[in-house]
Amino acid sequence: MSEFLVNLLGERLVNGEKAEVDVQALGSRLSLLGLYFGCSLNGPCKQFNASLTEFYSKFKKSSEHKDKLEIVFISSDQDQKQWQDFLQEMQWPALPFKDRHKKMKLWNKYKVTSIPSLVFIDAATGKVVCRNGLLVVRDDPKGLEFPWGPKPFAEVVSGPLLRNNRQTTDSTALEGSYVGVYFSAHWCPPCRSLTRVLVESYRKVKETGQKFEIVFVSADRSEESFTQYFSEMPWLAVPYSDEARRSRLNRLYGIQGIPTLILLDTEGHMITRQGRVEILNDPDCGLFPWHPRPVLELSESNAVQLHEGPCLVLFVDAEEEGELDPAKELIQPIAEKIMAKYKAKEEETPLLFFVAGEDDMSDSLRDYTNLPEAAPLLTILDMSARAKYVKDVEEITPAVVEQFVSGFLAEKLKPEPI
């Protein structure tokens, strides 16, 4: 356990009194670690920091598990004094200010997209236990549900579900169906746009006779808004009044932003968190139930994934439909290998794979990342770290791709700034 945490965090952390904290000694007693991503200049972070301090203080005083949990602050501060001042308000240690490389690795590894964020992980393996610790602090202020591990979807969603004619059905009606858990709200323009597309996709899948259902989990700000929005939807919803169940579903899937569409198989296991991208990329619904594909063709609808972690992008000279197929076939084996390896470990893949042809999206990405115009061009782009890795060779072979990917995952490649 200690060795894993040393690899993850380094040998030393620091606390608000500028004292060092030995990670190996810390790891010898822990079972759960909370990674708290934040910034002193962020208003919501300051508010959450106060709540977390109260939660942490109560837990350490009264919980029978008080020695099994620790929090580590991962800062996005750019000014060391501001970071130090903020750290003095905390009762837990932090990653050293200078250790920016480890900070970015943690952001990428745990798919953090916003702050404040609190991710609880198994201290022995690093596996995510709970992605949305903010809701743990809000909903379980005494820490009675420690260690906040995931529960089966059927258990969390259990209870009556609404139809937009105000009739209800029990959640057991979902048994044996593929399910989309749709986190959305009327006040959010991207949500409303996705809902229009999703209504058509839902209709098309149902017409094929497939057992498919969607459950709307509202983030609306009033029941009136919920009712208005839900009237556009032909599927089911968690009642707006059942705030506790809505919150538990948000916690279960670590929702950090909307719209989010989680797709589940008939056993309630997750197929993908990227239901939004899958739906937009497959208007004919021919790929239902939308299992993740090892290699994607870069498009406007899936470009959002470039900001969710490191991505390998192979740029090629292709303009017509079908011309990208040889490029996809080139990187498919290594993409499948990486996907299978991390699926077996029940971890998210550390690298997504794209091919990009000659179009406006590709041109925009090249311009933004200041890439050469060469084609083919093999790259790994890490937007959150503002770093790129470029393999500019005359011939790109499977061996070249595998060596490039292996070097990146082993941290042997030297990044260039974006």
Curated annotation (Swiss-Prot):
It comes from the Eukaryota. InterPro entries: Thioredoxin-like_fold (IPR012336), Thioredoxin-like_sf (IPR036249), Thioredoxin_domain (IPR013766), TryX_NRX_thioredoxin_dom (IPR045870). One of its GO terms (cellular component) is nucleus. Keywords: Cytoplasm, Developmental protein, Differentiation, NAD, Nucleus, Oxidoreductase, Wnt signaling pathway. It is found in: Cytoplasm, Cytosol; Nucleus. Belongs to the nucleoredoxin family. Functions as a redox-dependent negative regulator of the Wnt signaling pathway. This is Nucleoredoxin.
